[in-house]
């Protein structure tokens, strides 16, 4: 009976005590170290170059940006308060900035919501969802003082400083540019700086997949470095760089500066037997806890596990004396990298499993609150019998790095991917993600969310059911070929999503994720459109304080269960299901 329940409910898996997992990971690390003495350590081959492509489908013209959904408002008692459409691929195409995927990213501020994507930036009224500005990424960076932009943008709002912070590729993708607003108004003036993220080997380079995090001491930007070793050669992974910028260099009376920045380069070579493992897609841990050292987490280059290390010695005015602490592998439940995600694609069977669910890198922000560190990633667990992706969350003790809780959000018959989370000072956690499957009625790629609270032991206790925030408008998303055709090329999705907390009311969480818009043709409302698919983004506001607490029996099962624990059933129609 319990196994049947696991098939019908979202799954939060607390199997395998952390101490046993930690011993297993230590043993695996020792074996890996021994093996490395005789042969080269090779990074996971699917940790690949992610710079987006500016696509141009032959014959596919975008003549309008019709069809945006109106804002959605639910009853104040509903945990899903409001939803509104963000930037779409139609918007980017209007600037001839037609990138895939969007690199979905946004943050909520004092009165606005700001979104960045590959090609376009936008600002919205956070209470009504009304869009107050739309611009190309190139135009935004021009007003901030830079020339050109090339995607991979991220944005955050710093509540203590009441300022916005954005990062993106420069015109040359070896460079990173960093902008800070002068006030809390995202539509006001910004100032910026540019610095070389990774110089390469003399034949071009990319400081790929820049991450962004802030604590009370510094701002952290991690990059995955790629470069060819010959003129015209292909890009290969060359290591990572962690850039640490003290807060005083960021928020000052003039402009952001990197004069007192620390840079930690960890090289990688396919032929080396001594490659250090400081992970892939290094994510600084966001925290408002004063003092102490910074913390960085990442997926291991070699093991199916995450690792963590400290950044020590960042002074109020300088990071130049900072140093990195030793790496600790946290010892997660066994998993493998996820496969492609499913979708119904009723008309074209070949397109039913083409959408990229990504890999196990930590693609979205990581948070510390109340002495605990929270993170999510996409995995294919080895403790189930289905080849389906799950959003895996992990909670760590911030002092010891011991796992307090971990689990998989998922339901049999569906893939779950592109997760993100945020946590407030009350220990309330909201996780957003995509879900899709083969079922024609419920399998379209959907943007979903769930809320949790953290108990005294650090475990997540479900508060809401699975909330449908936005459903895709087509059952067959493929970008790179026209409507009715088989998918061509890699079907990128994401590459990330984000959750942020309203600085005016920390019970309110703003989630942003990707969905599939209608095709660019007459049937989709685009006269003269020639048939390419288009992505969209959706912003949802979830009030964690309005979410009902589970029944006592459910709570007891979730806290004290020794194996996998069933979460609450999905709640859809009662909470609003936007088309």
Pin down the residues of each PLM region.
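Short, Lys/Arg-enriched N-terminal segments with co-localized hydrophobic residues
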Residues: 2-10
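Generic extreme N-terminus detector
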Residues: 5, 14-16, 553, 561
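Serine/threonine-rich, low-complexity intrinsically disordered segments
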Residues: 5, 34-36, 556, 579
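Gram-negative bacterial Sec-dependent N-terminal signal peptides
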Residues: 9-39
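Hydrophobic alpha-helical membrane context
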Residues: 33-34, 563, 573
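C-terminal PAP-associated
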Residues: 41-547
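A short, hydrophobic C-terminal helix/tail in secreted or cell-surface proteins
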Residues: 550-569
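C-terminal membrane-anchoring or membrane-association module
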Residues: 566-579
């Amino acid at each position: 009976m319990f196994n049947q329940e696991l098939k019908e409910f979202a799954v939060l898996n607390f199997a395998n005590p952390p101490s046993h997992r930690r011993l297993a990971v230590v043993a695996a690390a020792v074996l890996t170290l021994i093996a490395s003495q005789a042969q080269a350590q090779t990074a996971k081959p699917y940790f690949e170059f992610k710079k987006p492509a500016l696509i141009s489908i032959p014959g596919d013209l975008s003549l309008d940006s019709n069809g945006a959904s109106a804002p959605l408002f639910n009853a104040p008692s509903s945990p899903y308060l409001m939803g509104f459409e963000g930037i779409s691929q139609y918007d980017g195409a209007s600037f001839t900035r037609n990138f895939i995927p969007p690199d979905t990213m946004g943050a909520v501020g004092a009165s606005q919501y700001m979104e960045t994507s590959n090609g376009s930036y936008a600002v919205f009224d956070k209470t009504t969802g009304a869009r107050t500005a739309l611009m190309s990424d190139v135009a935004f960076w021009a007003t901030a003082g830079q020339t050109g932009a090339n995607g991979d943008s991220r944005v955050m709002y710093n509540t203590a400083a009441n300022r916005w912070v954005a990062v993106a590729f420069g015109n040359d993708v070896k460079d990173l540019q960093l902008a800070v607003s002068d006030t809390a108004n995202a539509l006001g003036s910004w100032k910026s700086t540019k610095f070389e993220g990774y110089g390469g080997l003399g034949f071009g380079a990319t400081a790929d997949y820049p991450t962004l995090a802030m604590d009370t001491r510094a701002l952290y930007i991690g990059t995955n470095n790629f470069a060819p070793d010959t003129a015209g050669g292909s890009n290969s992974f060359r290591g990572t760089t962690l850039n640490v910028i003290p807060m005083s260099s960021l928020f000052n009376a003039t402009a952001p500066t990197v004069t007192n920045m620390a840079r930690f380069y960890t090289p990688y070579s396919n032929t080396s037997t001594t490659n250090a493992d400081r992970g892939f897609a290094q994510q600084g841990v966001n925290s408002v806890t004063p003092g102490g050292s910074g913390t960085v987490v990442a997926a291991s280059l070699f093991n199916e596990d995450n690792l963590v290390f400290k950044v020590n010695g960042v002074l109020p005015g300088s990071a130049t004396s900072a140093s990195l602490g030793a790496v600790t592998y946290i010892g997660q439940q066994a998993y493998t990298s996820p496969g492609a995600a499913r979708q119904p694609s009723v008309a074209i069977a070949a397109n039913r499993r083409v959408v990229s669910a990504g890999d196990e890198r930590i693609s979205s922000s990581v948070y510390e609150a109340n002495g605990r560190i929270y993170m999510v990633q996409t995995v294919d667990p080895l403790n189930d019998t289905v080849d389906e992706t799950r959003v895996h969350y992990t909670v760590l003790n911030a002092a010891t790095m011991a796992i307090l809780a971990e689990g998989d959000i998922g339901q049999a018959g569906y893939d779950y991917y592109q997760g993100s989370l945020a946590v407030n000072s009350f220990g309330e956690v909201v996780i957003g993600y995509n879900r899709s499957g083969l079922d024609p009625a419920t399998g379209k790629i959907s943007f979903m969310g769930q809320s949790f609270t953290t108990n005294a032991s650090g475990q997540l206790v479900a508060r809401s059911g699975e909330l449908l925030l936005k459903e895709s408008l087509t059952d067959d998303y493929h970008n790179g070929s026209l409507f009715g055709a088989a998918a061509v090329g890699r079907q990128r999705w994401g590459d990330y999503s984000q959750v942020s907390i309203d600085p005016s009311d920390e019970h309110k969480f703003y989630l942003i994720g990707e969905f599939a818009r209608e095709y660019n043709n007459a049937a989709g409302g685009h006269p003269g459109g020639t048939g390419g698919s288009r992505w969209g983004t959706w912003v949802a506001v979830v009030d964690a304080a309005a979410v009902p607490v589970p029944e006592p029996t459910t709570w007891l099962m979730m806290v004290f269960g020794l194996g996998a624990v069933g979460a609450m059933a999905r709640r859809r129609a009662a909470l609003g299901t936007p088309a």
